[in-house]
């Protein structure tokens, strides 16, 4: 996608969702272990779960499940009984669940003050604005691209409403690259620690523990992901095994 169009459509998503996930809300107890979220970027229901994580300043290991993906989708179907997204695993509460509304309620009850913000609580409005947001980027973060699986999950500092972070998440999603998501929305008490690590308050910020590389700038991050993990052009999803290796006929 053209860079200007990519940015414009990403901004449009943020506008459609009225900036939900841009700032931290009231925080409650903090989880001892990161949550796990199986989702794909373009899904409006998955977006609700990600917005809740951003508002509640929660980390999560994200397992991208784009259409046609074979790396993590089968795990969801095996554990939950169906390939439906989002799928949240909370090891701190011992729960696993589908349904974005149930996920949002669980997160705000356990990790917030129990009150779900209007941007996530008004079901008809949320459904319509979420659908409009997805229409703004109809081809982004939807279908799998053949890729090599990293040995260890990457790390991404981000917040849901940022149009630049969204572009990076699109790339991670279509390449089925798992990553530890560190949410640092406006008002996050963890921003100071992030600045101490990265040197400035700017997101997206990607760290790849497999190569030791750390990068700012969405365009540079996407180029790095393509260069490091995308397989050659022309490969199809069925050519690539669930572990990211190329299938070879016997």
Regions found by a protein language model. Name each.
Residues 1-161, 166-250:
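GST-like domain detector, emphasizing the conserved glutathione-binding G-site
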């Amino acid at each position: 996608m053209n860079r200007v169009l990519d940015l414009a459509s990403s901004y449009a998503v943020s506008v459609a969702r009225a900036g939900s996930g841009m700032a931290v809300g009231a925080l409650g107890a903090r989880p001892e272990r990161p949550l796990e979220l199986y989702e794909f970027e373009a899904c409006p229901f998955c977006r609700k779960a990600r917005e809740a994580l951003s508002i509640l300043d929660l980390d999560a290991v994200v397992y991208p499940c784009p259409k046609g993906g074979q790396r993590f989708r089968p795990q969801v179907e095996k554990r939950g009984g169906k390939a439906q997204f989002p799928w949240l695993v909370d090891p701190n509460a011992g729960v696993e669940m589908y349904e974005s509304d149930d996920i949002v309620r669980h997160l705000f009850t356990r990790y917030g003050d129990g009150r779900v913000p209007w941007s996530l609580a008004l079901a008809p409005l949320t459904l319509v604005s979420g659908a409009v947001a997805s229409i703004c980027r109809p081809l982004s973060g939807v279908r799998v691209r053949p890729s090599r699986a990293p040995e260890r999950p990457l790390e991404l500092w981000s917040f849901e409403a940022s149009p630049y972070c969204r572009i990076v998440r699109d790339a991670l999603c279509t390449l089925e690259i798992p990553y530890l998501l560190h949410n640092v929305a406006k008002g996050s008490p963890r921003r100071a620690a992030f600045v101490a690590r990265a040197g400035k308050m700017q997101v997206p910020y990607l760290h790849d523990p497999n190569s030791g590389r750390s990068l700012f700038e969405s365009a540079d991050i996407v180029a790095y992901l393509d260069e490091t993990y995308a397989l050659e052009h022309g490969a199809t999803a069925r050519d690539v095994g669930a572990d990211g290796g190329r299938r070879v006929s016997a």
